[in-house]
Amino acid sequence: MNSTVAPASVADIRKIFLDFFASKGHTVVPSSPLVPGNDPTLMFTNSGMVQFKDVFLGTDKRSYVRAASVQACLRAGGKHNDLENVGYTARHHTFFEMLGNWSFGDYFKRDSLKWGWELLTKVYKLPADKLWATVYIDDDEAYNIWTQEIGLPPERVVRIGDNKGAKYASDNFWMMADTGPCGPCSEIFYDHGPAIAGGPPGSPEQDGDRYIEIWNHVFMQYDMQPDGSVKPLPAPCVDTGMGLERLAAILQHVHSNYEIDIFDALIKAAARETGCTDLGNKSLRVIADHIRATAFLVSDGVLPSNEGRGYVQRRIIRRAIRHGYKLGQKAPFFYKLVPDLVTLMGEAYPGLATQAERIAQVLQAEEERFFETLANGMQILDETLTGDAKVLPGDVAFKLHDTFGFPLDLSADVCRERGVEVDEAGFHAAMEKQKAQGRAAGKFRMDRALEYSGDGNDFVGYERLTEVTKIVALYADSTPVSELKAGQAGVVVLAATPFYGESGGQVGDQGAIFSDGAMFDVADTQKIKADVFGHHGVLKSGALKIGDVVTAHVNASLRAATQRNHSATHLMHKALREVLGAHVQQKGSLVNAERTRFDFAHNAPVTDEQIREVEARVNSEILSNAATQSRVMDIDAAQETGAMMLFGEKYGESVRVLDIGASRELCGGTHVARTGDIGLFKVVAESGVASGVRRIEAVTGQNALSYLQDLEDTVTQVAGTLKAPVVEINERVAGVLDHLKSLEKEIAALKGKLASAQGDELVTQAVDVKGIKVLVAMLEGADTKTLRDTMDKLKDKLKSAVIVLAAVEGDKVQIAAGVTSNSVGKVKAGELVNFVASQVGGKGGGKPDMAMAGGTEPAKLPAALASVMAWVSAKL
């Protein structure tokens, strides 16, 4: 492995590490998923050795005995939980990358330590006088290798004893478990210098930041016995791990991991999306760290949920959102960082790039969900923590968790910033109390936000949209009140109501509640209990009191549009079962005035032909104009009619059976009187939302007509551009594409001729430098292929040469570097192209004899090209 200059980027550090160990006979192994496939006891992959655990235990064998990898790791749950420190220290992260090399019964201490020293001092070029090492107190072999063979001064090799209270309980003795493979380890430290507080390893001041551990070499040479004794292993192994971010901080001459190139870019992206101008703000650090963790988790199949790994994911996402909110961002922003992350890490982790769109969708959905309650939750925190409060009560922390979706550690994060502790015992007691109440209730959990003990409402919304009725309860800020005044937001409960409360996927009605001098705008209707509807809105004028007689009026146009979509959903469900199969089951739905969104069980995308068939069946039912019928009957009788029942849904003794066309389902929603009232049905989107779950979105009535008219406008515009009748668009487009292909072939042929001609002309411009021809040139109008073709011809003609060719197209720079085979021992094309690209805002890579790069600063290209001669001369 040749020496090289200190790498300028995290990407360089990764590549150099893997290349180095590949040159030492190691097999480069890809990073394993963050969800361990071989260890159900481990929540997340937290080190490079996880994927090799079975090899060390002897239950698995590999085709190689030496391995190296760059492993994606996560520490944010369970035993290894750094979440509360992330963003507040220089080196704590949720997601991090671990550089590692392993020997499975092959080489041992001597090669491991010597290669480590070679890589750090000869390749990465760390100053040898800045490095320290620790060894286990009894490990004379490792100590002698450091002091006698490598030449590290004895005063910088520290023996660490059993500093944890028992034999082999030491920072420098590693055990996989209470019994089994174990052994001493040797850690390499970097000294940041006397300007930073802290003492050397093993000293009382070792916890400072001056001496930082960068690489741990574990030597598994013993088998720990149940009695605490050790026996030699027949085939000792090596397991090493080096934090990429820590190493990058040293190589890039910064003290904090958050100052390295990859975090610098993510912090700037977070600042862009939050509007924060202080790049040193710790909240930006949190966001930059968390986008890595959450994106990689989604990439590995971990979606936000309320349990297990999914809840860790939710906690991390919501912590990032809260820090964005703290910076003044009141709308979803976090998902917008995904493209930045893909740019930085997509090449090293291809799965990140291929799933970028899905990752952004998952994060955006979680953001939208949390932003609905974040402001209210923060208001409660602010009110509770006013004055000289020293503790956040456990019941308040639980309310934030249960009602507003605040994970406990998010509330603790806010409290820590204000010097306040959280009563965690009280929190857990409140949670256990709720669980006990839920077990006792056994059936229906009531809305905890509004306490109502009166009679149920009389729902008249199936028959009419207006009802004269009486106010029986009023609420403001979730608290019962006797009166609402103008300007107040609140909830109104009526003795009878035509408003439908959100249920079964259908949104709640909107409208107005009014009396002489009072007008209450109803923005939403939600169930407080199964038979009690709360009308949520704002009192625009006058006053409302309990006992007032009022008129309740539903917005008729919104109700009608919602009914069309709901009835169409039933017809679509029936059609999907007929077209795709009886396995189709509803998994979720949302029906409002704009569209219907229907999630269902199905393991493959619905084809265009299948969608057309579903549309045809639904529209056929609409054209039949069949009357809708509803009947209330007991559950057993409903089952005998063959009515479709949703799997997992809880039904009472009496149910409402709804017949719409050929569909028969149990449903309490509102529907059209006849199928013809739907007007028209059109599917507008089909997608996957989870493993085995598909989603169809559709529109009806006027919305369907508008959608088709928009499509027609687009088709008409395309026809106009092509100067062809609409019916001939396909034929005309095919002709244009054929003509385009023909032109592309002609252009390619011309470029080939141009490359040949330019090659002949450029040969005369080559300069002899120490016996090797060096050629640097700009090619006008060339693309990447032309650069490559010209490069190949020049290498053939010049025989022994180093060549750099460049071209500019708009604001983009393309650079090619080529080295003939007899010169690659002195000059590497990859190093050369990166040298040039780094001066024009870009980077690249390739093989030793041919490499390509791009850039974004064409104005700097002439100076960059002018510097090539001196660079090459220094290498020769």
Curated annotation (Swiss-Prot):
Gene3D superfamilies: 2.40.30.130, 3.10.310.40, 3.30.54.20, 6.10.250.550, Bira Bifunctional Protein, Domain 2, Threonyl-trna Synthetase, Chain A, domain 2. GO terms for biological process: alanyl-tRNA aminoacylation; negative regulation of DNA-templated transcription. Zn(2+) binds at residues 566, 570, 667, 671. GO terms for cellular component: cytosol. It is found in: Cytoplasm. It catalyses: tRNA(Ala) + L-alanine + ATP = L-alanyl-tRNA(Ala) + AMP + diphosphate. Keywords: Aminoacyl-tRNA synthetase, ATP-binding, Cytoplasm, Ligase, Metal-binding, Nucleotide-binding, Protein biosynthesis, RNA-binding, tRNA-binding, Zinc. NCBIfam families: alaS (TIGR00344). This is Alanine--tRNA ligase. It comes from Albidiferax ferrireducens (strain ATCC BAA-621 / DSM 15236 / T118) (Rhodoferax ferrireducens). The lineage of its organism: Bacteria, Pseudomonadati, Pseudomonadota, Betaproteobacteria, Burkholderiales. The gene is alaS.
